[in-house]
């Protein structure tokens, strides 16, 4: 295991904090809160108890002359005042975390300590390519859906691997299999393994497979390369058997795929073709696309969970993902986004039909519920806001998702990126800000935009997930498969821990999973508590 798995230790408090920590060990107070280095409020100087202040002349010794009942009453009042001060101080020192449901519907493990244990391990290399030297193998997990992940493999000819390219090539020739495994993330169990080479002729073990788990269609879709063309295979979610397959055209060798829910947007490009050919495919019927067509030069269709938006003849159309029917769409966007809490509304950034650049919220009919002018080139939909950029891309502006009104604007002092964070609880907006060669993670309050914290991070770090009390950043330049994850406190920005893997580490839904350089996957956990995974 890496050397950096020890639990996060807070800085040693100074003398004042140590005194407060010792006093806080009395019953009714959590001493762990005192150890974060916060200093308790110190009483202001004043006359000593029983001393005569300026307003007490002529009444010396009043405390001494009081009756026993009066002294007892004064003591009770003093205790009440002290208790109130402790309560107020405790509230001020207690971090505030978000409440409510997880953004995107995925509850992410709340790992406040470095993951020093594993709840399961699966030898994926042995399941997918037992005859291939492990140094030659690369594993490709899909996005997790309903707690399931499909994992494909390819033989890597990288000469920097422990096995040279010739040895890897020989292994691929000796074992031309192309296997896919379905993994149950909660149980850490391989549900099934299927070798595509049994039904699909000409599969290439060097090809990088792309998988999609589609529980609503009862299928796992796998695209891989064969001799001369691509092939898309539908496997049964229950047992991995082949349900159907379809081959791409040999004259359209380049195929890229975007996925959303049970829909795929497939782009095919021929040599010398000035524009792509597009098809919208439902996972339940690969041979009969819902829609096929082209887009204006310089534009591309944009996929939605229930269809797509395409611009043809300078007119934007929304295509229904079930019927393929088209209807007018009130914007010609460069970017679209949908909130998981309101899938019926499409947020679009781009050119309105009149020519002005706007960000808009459009309903299913394609009519704009609201529209706001913007100079932004990018945006993100967060729990409370549609966040856009402005003023040379250093200011974040929150547009209220309900009506498009400006809720707040905060200048972050540098270029930044904002993304909706899977699993986050609460309305904070997380941004990675770049300035003068340095980067910082900034948390902005969803209420008014004030910066709740700002903490240094790596220039290539990206926010990959969040839980109720933790924000997780991928800490490597390989965005899809980061080699490290760093955890930060969601209320204070304090760094909690960093985990680095010799292979890859990423979130499979709400579970943090590492795949080492031997092809063994492990779910990383804090052995004191693990949150529920969706």
Descriptions of predicted regions:
Residues 43-213, 328, 518-534:
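N-terminal "mature head" segments of proteins
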Residues 118-133, 189-202, 241-247, 287-294, ...:
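A short beta-strand motif characteristic of beta-propeller blades
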Residues 131-144, 196-215, 248-262, 294-307, ...:
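Repeated scaffold domains used in trafficking and secretory/extracellular systems
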Residues 146-173, 212-227, 260-272, 301-312, ...:
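Short beta-strand elements that form the blades of beta-propeller/WD-repeat-like
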Residues 170-179, 228-233, 272-279, 314-319, ...:
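Structural motif
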Residues 185-187, 236-239, 283-286, 320-324, ...:
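Short loop/turn segments that connect beta-strands within beta-propeller blades
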Residues 250-378, 386-387:
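Solenoidal tandem-repeat scaffolds enriched in leucines and small polar residues
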Residues 493-534:
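Blade-level signature of beta-propeller repeat domains, shared across WD40, Kelch, NHL, RCC1
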């Amino acid at each position: 295991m890496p050397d950096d798995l020890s639990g996060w230790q807070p800085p040693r408090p100074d003398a004042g904090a140590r005194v407060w920590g010792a006093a806080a060990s009395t019953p009714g107070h959590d001493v762990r809160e005192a150890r974060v280095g916060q200093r308790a409020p110190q009483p202001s100087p004043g006359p000593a108890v029983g001393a005569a202040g300026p307003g007490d002349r002529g009444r010396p010794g009043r405390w001494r002359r009081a009756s026993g009942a009066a002294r007892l009453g004064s003591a009770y009042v003093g205790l009440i005042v002290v208790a109130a001060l402790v309560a107020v101080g405790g509230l001020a020192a207690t971090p505030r975390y978000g409440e409510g449901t997880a953004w995107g519907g995925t509850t992410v493990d709340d790992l406040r300590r470095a993951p020093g244990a594993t709840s399961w391990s699966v030898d994926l290399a042995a399941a997918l390519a037992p005859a291939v030297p492990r140094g030659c193998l690369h594993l490709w997990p899909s996005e997790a859906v309903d707690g399931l992940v499909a994992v494909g493999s390819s033989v890597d000819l990288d000469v920097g691997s422990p096995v040279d390219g010739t040895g890897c090539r020989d292994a691929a020739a000796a074992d031309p299999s192309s296997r896919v495994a379905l993994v149950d993330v909660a149980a850490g169990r391989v549900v099934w393994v299927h070798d595509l080479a049994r039904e699909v002729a000409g599969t290439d073990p060097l090809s990088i497979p792309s998988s999609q788990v589609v529980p609503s269609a009862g299928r796992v879709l796998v695209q891989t390369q064969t001799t001369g063309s691509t092939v898309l295979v539908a496997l049964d979610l229950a047992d991995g058997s082949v349900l159907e397959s379809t081959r791409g055209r040999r004259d359209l060798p380049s195929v890229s795929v975007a996925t959303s829910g049970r829909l795929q947007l497939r782009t095919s490009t021929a040599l010398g073709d000035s524009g792509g050919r597009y098809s919208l495919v439902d996972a339940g019927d690969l041979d009969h696309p819902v829609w096929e067509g082209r887009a204006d030069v310089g534009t591309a269709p944009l996929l939605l969970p229930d269809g797509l938006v395409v611009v043809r003849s300078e007119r934007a159309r929304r295509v229904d993902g079930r019927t393929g029917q088209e209807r007018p769409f009130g914007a010609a966007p460069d970017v679209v986004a949908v909130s998981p809490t309101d899938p019926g509304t499409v947020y679009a950034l781009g050119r309105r039909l009149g020519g002005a650049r706007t960000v808009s919220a459009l309903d299913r009919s394609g009519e704009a519920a609201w529209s706001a002018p913007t100079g932004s080139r990018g945006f993100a939909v967060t729990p409370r806001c549609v966040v856009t950029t402005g003023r040379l891309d250093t200011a974040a502006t929150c547009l209220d998702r309900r009506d498009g009104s400006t809720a707040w604007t905060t200048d972050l002092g540098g270029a930044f990126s904002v993304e909706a964070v899977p699993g986050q609880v609460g309305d904070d907006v997380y941004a990675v800000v770049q300035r003068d060669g340095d980067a910082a993670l900034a948390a902005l309050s969803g209420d008014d935009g004030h910066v709740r914290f700002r903490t240094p991070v790596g220039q290539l770090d990206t926010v990959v997930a969040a839980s109720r009390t933790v924000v997780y950043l991928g800490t490597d330049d390989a965005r899809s498969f980061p080699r490290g994850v760093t955890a930060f406190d969601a209320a204070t920005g304090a760094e909690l821990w960093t985990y680095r893997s010799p292979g890859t580490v990423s979130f499979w839904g709400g579970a943090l999973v590492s795949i080492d350089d031997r092809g063994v996957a492990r779910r990383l956990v804090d052995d004191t508590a693990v949150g529920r995974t969706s």
